[in-house]
Structure formats: structure tokens, C-alpha cells
Amino acid sequence: VTPPSPGEPQRRVTAHLVTGSTVLGGRVLFGQDPAEVVRDLGGLSPNTSLRAVDVLTELVEAPDGTPLHIDRVVFAEAGTRAAWPSAAAGSGLSPSPTELAAGEDLPQDRPRLRRFASYGIVDGPDGRVLLSRIAEGFPGAGTWHLPGGGVDAGEDVRAALRREVAEETGQDGQVGDLLTVSSHHRGQPGGHEIYAVWVFFHVFVASPRPARVLEENGSTADSGWFTPEEVAGLRLSATAQRGLAYMARHSRP
């Protein structure tokens, strides 16, 4: 896994299952699906439906002085009531920073890239959806993508999304509910192995402006507002397909 730059915190991801007033937790290792980690923690069947409850950003130091950036992803069984966030009050969540201080012992056979990314299903008062187009030279070049991207070391997951929306589209969005959590893991023989955890939030832009890219020499070539009918005719990135498919399944008729 690519090591952090000098002075940057070590990155960790944990997954948690809220059952009533109890919170179970486990470390998410490279390549693991957070939802599968949670099902294993709770002794649930592989087909058990889960709902994403929350994502927490924790910036701490381990007892040995190691700075840690922990992204904690919280789930509950679909259709159940969960005492969140009161279930997390008082004692800290497990695994603790002490338990997370050690790095992973991964094979050294290839470069590995790990990413925790936050994306928005962004809309405005008229129901149009905000998308950004990936620039040439980046994975998925030319496809339309959800505004968002990697969470920087030391950055809160929601603050990162609001920043990305502003940089990629010129909009001031309010980050709302967590919608779903997904993971992506792929590798090529002799090439990099890439692993990412994607979290998707609803973002509302109360006062939409014409979309324009503010970042320079970045991964975004263009951005724009689209009706749902127009979105159906666009070539979408894998991330956008996954996030918009979730919305299509869960939107009210």
C-alpha cells in the first residue's frame, strides 16, 4: 500500500453494526467490503440487507504517538431501529486507536493503492442532477461522474465532499443524508491493485448557478446540470452508475 507522506496520519477504515443500543466494530482490511465485515461481525447471512447509518472521521494519536485518520462506517440491518448516535456515546468505538496502530502485512508482489472517497448525488430545487466529466488522462476519461473524490488525510468526510463539489462544479452544496456505501477492488496482472471504499451522500444546492469547473489541471474537464431524462442518455462512470442505481431503486414513485 502506498505509504503516507511524511507527517501525514496513517489511514484506517473500520465498519460497525448497530443493533439496538449495542455497537459492534471491526477493522476493514485492504480489499474487504465493509458490508461483509459487518455481516461477519453480527453473524448475519450474506443476503442480509443493510442500511448505511453514518460515517465518522476520527483524527487521533495511538499510544505510541502514531497519528491516525480513522474513517468509521456505520451500518444497521435494513428495517430495524438503531439507537444511533446515542449508542456511540460515552465509551469510544471499537476497534480502538491502540488496536488500529499496527499496519497491515501485505504481500510485496505489486503496488497497491488504497482510497476512501466521498461522492454526492447532487440536486437542486428543480430536480436536475449535477454531474462532472472526467478529464483525459484519468481513469474513466470522458464519462460523466458524481461530484466528489478522495478524502484527504486529516480531512472530514463531509467537508471533503463539500470542497469537491465547489472545485468541480462551482456550487455551494449542503451535505445531507448518507445514502449508501460501496467498495471497489480490482487489479491487473503485473499492474497496480486498487481498492476503494465509496460513500455516497445526498447534497442539495439551494441556489444553483451555471456549473463551471474551478479547479485547475485537475481530474474534471466539465460539469453541468441534467434532467433525469438527460442523465439516462449519458455515458456514466462506474461510480456514477452505482450511486444513481441506488437512487433509482430507493426513490419513491
Where are these regions (language model features)?
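N-terminal strand-loop-strand
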Residues: 1-29, 104-144, 173, 177
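Ordered, small/hydrophobic-rich secondary-structure cores
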Residues: 1-67
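Acidic, metal-coordinating catalytic segment for phosphate/diphosphate chemistry
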Residues: 1-9, 58-121
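The catalytic Nudix box helix
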Residues: 27-51, 146-179
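A generic structural micro-feature
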Residues: 64-70, 110-114, 143, 191-197, ...
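A generic structural signal for short hydrophobic patches within well-formed alpha-helices
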Residues: 231-232
